[in-house]
């Protein structure tokens, strides 16, 4: 899938007495079933994705066989955009930009979204509750609510296919129980097999410009001996990724750090300021994604993630460098 690009939630104050409480083992059972279904079964369906009062329809074809895990996402908005995933390689075909981008998949960009299998650490910053069962895309679904204990992360309301375990619907929930992002299958099938031809893109064009994301030698990083650190993180967030690489379409070197609580994550990008560059200063919001930017000396720092604004600002303001 194409990489995606608030105050204390009021719903934390709501009594959960009406919800059916289940042991931790039941929650983990369903998370494991979701994980298995998203990677280990064939499915073919149509879903809608929405944010900022805008909805987009997409078709997904997912196959597991002798060639491993293959997936094709097709935009139904007329743009011709497609995403092909084969193992851990993702190819994005963008006809409107006459380009093809090849990258490695990351857990935070997978569809359906990837959820942790164990909740011991998550339980420190989230509560888990089962709600009333429902029906999504004609399938009976169990309802699972993941509720944050503070203002630094969003919650999730999940509807999971009772038979297969596939995640059929997800509401990303912010303050005042506001839905900041959502997806929902409108039609779903589980075929025994899928013709490989259906997983091949019809939109690739040799005249398109191809971009291959490649990590580069960190010794060549523009920041030299300078090391970056984050002095203040929300509870539960720990280091997840630290790497140096070139920006896919500009080839500019950037240092990338990611912190995660196991469900929510924030990424920090540090790059050398370029002359006449229009860098983000302050905050920006696009649906569930918040970003915050500031300059530190000759460098620009951008923090971005599917987390509330208070989180990216807290992290961004605490980024420091040590000149060794």
Feature locations, PLM:
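Bacterial N-terminal signal peptides that target proteins for export
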Residues: 1-7
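Short, surface-exposed coil-to-beta transition loops
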Residues: 55-59, 78, 152-156, 168, ...
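Gly/Pro-enriched, hydrophobic low-complexity segments
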Residues: 137-206
């Amino acid at each position: 899938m194409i990489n995606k690009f608030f105050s204390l939630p009021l719903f934390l104050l709501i009594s959960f007495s009406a919800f059916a409480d289940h042991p931790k083992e039941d929650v983990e059972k369903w998370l494991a079933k979701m994980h298995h279904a998203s990677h280990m079964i064939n499915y073919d369906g149509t879903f809608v994705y929405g944010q900022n009062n805008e909805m987009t329809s997409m078709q997904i074809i997912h196959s597991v066989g002798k060639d491993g895990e293959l997936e094709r996402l097709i935009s139904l908005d007329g743009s011709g955009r497609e995403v092909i995933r084969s193992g851990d390689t993702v190819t994005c075909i963008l006809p409107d930009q006459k380009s093809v981008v090849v990258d490695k998949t990351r857990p935070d960009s997978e569809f359906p979204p990837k959820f942790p299998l164990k909740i011991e650490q998550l339980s420190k910053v989230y509560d888990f509750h089962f709600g009333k069962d429902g029906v999504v895309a004609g399938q009976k679904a169990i309802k699972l609510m993941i509720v944050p204990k503070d203002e630094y992360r969003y919650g999730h309301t999940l509807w999971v296919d009772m038979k297969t375990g596939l995640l059929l619907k997800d509401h990303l929930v912010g303050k005042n129980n506001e839905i900041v992002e959502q997806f929902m299958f409108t039609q779903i099938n589980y075929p025994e097999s899928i013709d490989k031809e259906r997983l091949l893109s019809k939109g690739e064009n040799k005249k398109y410009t191809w971009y291959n994301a490649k990590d580069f030698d960190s010794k060549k990083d523009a920041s030299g001996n300078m090391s970056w650190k984050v002095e203040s993180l929300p509870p539960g967030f720990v280091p997840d990724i630290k790497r140096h690489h070139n920006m896919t379409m500009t080839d500019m070197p950037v240092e990338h750090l990611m912190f995660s609580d196991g469900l929510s994550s924030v990424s920090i990008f540090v790059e050398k300021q370029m002359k006449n560059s229009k860098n983000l200063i302050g905050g920006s919001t696009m649906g569930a994604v918040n970003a915050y930017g500031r300059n530190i000396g000759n460098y620009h720092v951008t923090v971005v993630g599917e987390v509330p604004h208070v989180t990216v600002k807290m992290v961004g303001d605490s980024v420091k460098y040590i000149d060794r």
